[in-house]
Amino acid sequence: MTFPVVGMIGGGQLARMTHEAGIPLGIRFKLLSDTPQDSAAQVVSDVVIGDYRDLGTLRAFAKGCDVITFDHEHVPTDHLRALEADGIPVRPGPDALVHAQDKGVMRAKLTEIGVPCPRHRLVTDPADVVAFAAEGAGFPVVLKTVRGGYDGKGVWVVDGPEEAADPFRAGVPVLAEEKVDYVRELAANVVRSPHGQAVAYPVVESQQVNGVCDTVIAPAPDLDETLALKAEEMALTIAKELGVVGHLAVELFQTRDGRILVNELAMRPHNSGHWTQDGAITSQFANHVRAVLDLPLGDPRPRAKWTAMVNVLGGDYPDMYSAYLHCMARDPQLKIHMYGKDVKPGRKVGHVNTYGDNLDDVLERARHAAGYLRGTITD
């Protein structure tokens, strides 16, 4: 019996959990990882250690793979086009992926197709920033590196002209955006297959702490049904217009005046979709596997009225395993997902999921477990 081989570029926790989702289907994974200690490299049997930025390494890795996918968006698109020319399906393809790699390209395309975004402009020096601010509501202005930023990195909130020079010292292109007056952050997660089948998960609320996702609530509490539907349709439109294959996460601002604006795109499984592992009929990881293999997509509906995901960040309590006894005894329904990473302060090392009919109870259980695992809660 022959099953396809999925080539996964990137060895982080997203690759690890995508691999886990493929196991029940008998799907084989081949992994290109930076080091043998990476999260996914600990669990995938066929691992190649190498540099994803090297075309020769990518070509050697792709031999024997039926399709290539990713757990990050950083692979050079020219290299991916070379793989496609070699006859290897790449999903999502480079023409789609560039919109998750380059914020300037993303903003231009979304504006072209009529998707609402914050006011923005590519800027080359502090004078451009001052001019951009003057044309709008003034300072503060948000500056972002066009490529490479994540979890709050590569983002500056500039309160005046005297701060506008800081982002340019790195010598990389910068995008200026208005500072959006938003009430909360949302995320719309969708999955699309090569032949165009698409499914949408419920829109979630994503709560950030110091620029890093802390808590996700599914579905987003008290979100007007019209706005929720608009967010889902917006994400499905983006996936179709950009030709996305696989999972697409659309990070959104819900503004104080009732609008929804696109913040960022991610073309891979996403932190805002981790709740689906235990809270949806088909997880984001399982549907990503199905999509890249062009299998029929699974049901994205939730299993419970409420699901909460809370990230477990590294703290001063390195022996997290010893915390399992308390967490599991206190909450037999708790789902713990650890990534096999060394515990370092502030590092994402796992997450917990809880679900139920009472939102306050679901959130309390998830936050208690995550805090106890980290060591910030001791009783």
Explain the meaning of each model-derived region.
Residues 229-250, 256, 266-315:
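Active-site "cap" helix and flanking loop/linker of ATP-utilizing ligase/carboxylase catalytic domains
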Residues 119, 140-143, 173-177, 248-249, ...:
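A short linear hydrophobic-aromatic micro-motif
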